[in-house]
C-alpha cells in the first residue's frame, strides 16, 4: 500500500526544526526536501529506506516535538469527512475505516467498553530506535490531530487518559515535557498507545455536520484509497525505483543515489533491473515522459516551466526530447 508523501515531508520539517542535518543527509541520496512534490505517493518500504538515512542515530524521544509538526490541512478529504460526520462516534469510525489516508505507519483501532472508549495505536517496530522514533512522532502527532479537529469542529477537547508503549524518559526535564504535553493521566510501559475517553463522548453531535458534504468527501476518500493501492502486477523493485524518482520536481536522482537510498549496491540494482527486462535509464525516461504529458495538458504551465520542472536546463533540450518521444513539439501537441 502506498500513501501520501506529506507524512514524510512533515517529519523532515520537524527534524529540521529540531536541528537535525536532514538536508545534508537527503543530499547524499539525491533529494532536496524543498523540491518534493506534495502530490506524490510513496510505498511504505521506500519511506522507511529514506528515513533510515535522514533519521540516523536520532534519539526516539525527540519524536515528542517532531510529531507536533504534522499539519491538519495535510489530511485533505479525510479531514473534511471527519468534520462533516454526524457524531464523534461516526467520525472516529471513519478515521479507522480510512486510516490509510493518515500519515501513520502503525495501525489504529477503536476499543469500546461500557464506560470508556479508546483510540489505540499499534506500532510494528518499537524494538528498534528508528521505529521507536517514528512511533513517538506519530503518537504525538495523533494527539495534536485529535485536539485540533475538536477545535475545528467547535467541540471542547475532553479530559483523557494517555497510555504510551515505552518507558518514561530518564531525564527529568524530558519527563516533564511529556507530562505537560500528554496531561495528568499519563502512563508509560503500556502494551499499546491509547487515548482513552469517557464513552459518553461518542454521542456528541458535531456542529459542522453536513450529510451532503459528507457523501462528497466519502467518495473522495474512496478514490484516494484506490489511488494509493499498490499495483501488484509490477515488481516491487521497479515500483520502488519509480517512486523514488517521482518524489521531487526539477531533479531526478542518479542511479548511484537511487541505489544508496534503497540500501542496495549500485551493481546489484543494475543487475536486478536487467533481470526484469528494464534499466534505470528506461525507468527514468518513462517517468519524464509521463510527467511531460501530464504537465502539457495544463495550459496554465508554460513550456519553459515544464522543462524546468522536469530537470532540463534549457527548454530547447526538452523540446528536442519531446519531439523524439511523441513526433511533434510541445507547442504542436498542445494545439
Regions found by a protein language model. Give the residues of each.
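DNA-contacting interfaces and partner/effector-binding or oligomerization modules
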Residues: 107, 111-204
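Short hinge/gating elements
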Residues: 76-82, 124-128, 203, 224
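Extended mid-to-C-terminal alpha-helical interaction segments
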Residues: 177-180, 184-335
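Short, well-ordered alpha-helical segments
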Residues: 89, 132-144, 211, 215, ...
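Amphipathic alpha-helix face/heptad-repeat signature
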Residues: 11, 84, 135-138, 258
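N-terminal low-complexity or simple alpha-helical regulatory segments
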Residues: 1-119
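Generic solvent-exposed, charged/amphipathic alpha-helical segments
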Residues: 12, 55, 96, 139-143, ...
Amino acid at each position: 500500500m502506498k500513501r501520501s508523501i506529506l507524512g514524510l515531508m512533515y517529519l523532515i520539517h520537524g527534524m529540521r526544526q529540531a536541528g537535525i542535518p536532514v538536508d545534508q543527509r537527503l543530499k547524499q541520496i539525491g533529494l532536496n526536501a524543498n523540491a518534493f512534490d506534495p502530490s506524490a505517493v510513496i510505498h511504505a518500504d521506500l519511506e522507511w529506506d529514506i528515513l533510515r538515512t535522514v533519521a540516523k542515530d536520532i534519539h526516539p524521544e525527540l519524536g515528542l516535538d517532531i510529531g507536533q509538526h504534522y499539519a491538519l490541512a495535510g489530511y485533505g478529504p479525510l479531514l473534511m469527512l471527519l468534520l462533516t460526520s454526524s457524531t464523534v462516534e461516526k467520525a472516529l469510525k471513519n478515521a479507522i475505516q480510512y486510516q490509510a489516508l493518515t500519515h501513520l505507519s502503525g495501525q489504529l483501532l477503536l476499543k469500546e467498553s461500557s464506560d470508556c472508549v479508546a483510540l489505540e495505536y499499534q506500532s510494528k517496530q518499537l524494538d528498534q530506535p528508528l521505529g521507536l522514533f517514528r512511533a513517538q512522532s506519530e503518537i504525538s502527532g495523533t494527539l495534536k490531530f485529535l485536539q485540533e479537529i475538536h477545535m475545528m469542529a467547535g467541540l471542547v477537547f475532553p479530559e483523557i487518559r494517555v497510555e504510551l508503549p515505552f518507558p518514561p524518559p530518564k531525564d527529568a526535564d524530558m519527563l516533564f515535557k511529556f507530562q505537560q504535553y500528554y496531561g495528568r493521566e499519563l502512563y508509560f510501559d503500556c502494551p499499546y498507545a491509547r487515548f482513552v475517553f469517557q464513552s459518553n463522548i461518542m454521542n456528541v453531535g458535531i456542529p459542522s455536520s453536513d450529510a451532503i458534504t459528507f457523501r462528497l468527501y466519502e467518495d473522495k476518500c474512496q478514490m484516494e484509497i484506490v489511488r494509493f493501492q499498490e499495483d501488484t502486477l509490477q515488481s516491487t523493485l521497479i515500483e520502488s525505483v519509480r517512486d523514488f524518482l517521482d518524489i521531487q520536481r526539477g531533479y531526478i536522482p542518479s542511479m548511484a543515489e537511487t541505489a544508496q537510498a534503497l540500501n542496495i549496491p549500485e551493481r546489484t540494482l543494475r543487475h536486478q533491473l536487467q533481470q526484469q527486462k528494464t534499466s534505470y535509464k528506461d525507468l527514468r525516461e518513462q517517468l519524464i515522459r509521463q510527467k511531460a504529458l501530464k504537465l502539457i495538458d495544463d495550459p496554465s504551465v508554460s513550456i519553459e516551466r515544464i522543462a524546468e520542472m522536469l530537470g532540463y536546463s534549457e527548454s530547447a533540450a526538452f523540446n528536442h526530447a519531446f519531439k523524439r518521444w511523441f513526433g511533434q513539439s510541445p507547442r504542436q501537441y498542445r494545439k
